[in-house]
């Protein structure tokens, strides 16, 4: 598990080089070394959050080298409301990965929870409706869909690594 540093709207360093606690910061080489990636971001106005965008924008060397081509990727997000931009956020996260030649793993409608959800979950990836205060727990359906997505990613990565 990795995270990305925060970015600032002012011209100054916003984060230490190494986090004091929690997941270590992702580095571009982490993408090169993995056989599959699950990439997540909170939704900001229907887009991925700026720190993830900044990180992905810094992967030009990997794009030029083609080092991420053929790797599977799955996506997940969380929004404040049901119509808060889950699908557009997941789509915005797909774009740089497709430019890298990565293979997007989504959720098929054979997942019953995807057909019946009144909360999070899309064919583009797993999602959670956190509520405007951010305090809504992950529903059972959201949890099952996230697990199904992780399982699909692992299965695809294993098959491609053979």
Positions of predicted regions on the chain:
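Short, glycine-/small-residue-rich phosphate/pyrophosphate-handling segment
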Residues: 69-122
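N-terminal beta1-alpha1-beta2 submodule of the flavodoxin-like/Rossmannoid cofactor-binding fold
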Residues: 1-68, 121, 128-162
């Amino acid at each position: 598990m990795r995270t990305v540093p925060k970015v600032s709207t002012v011209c100054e360093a916003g984060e230490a080089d190494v986090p004091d606690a929690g997941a270590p910061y992702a580095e571009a080489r982490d993408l090169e070394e993995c056989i599959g990636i699950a990439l997540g971001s909170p939704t900001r106005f229907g887009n991925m959050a700026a720190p993830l965008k900044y990180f992905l924008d810094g992967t030009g060397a990997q794009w030029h080298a083609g080092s991420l081509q053929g790797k599977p990727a799955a996506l997940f997000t969380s929004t404040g409301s049901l119509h808060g931009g889950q699908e557009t956020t997941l789509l915005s996260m797909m774009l740089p990965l497709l430019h890298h030649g990565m293979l997007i793993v989504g959720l098929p409608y054979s997942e019953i929870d995807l057909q019946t959800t009144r909360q999070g979950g899309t064919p583009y990836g797993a999602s959670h409706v956190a509520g405007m205060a951010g305090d809504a727990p992950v529903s059972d359906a959201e949890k099952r869909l996230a697990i199904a997505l992780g399982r699909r990613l692992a299965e695809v990565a294993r098959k491609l690594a053979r």
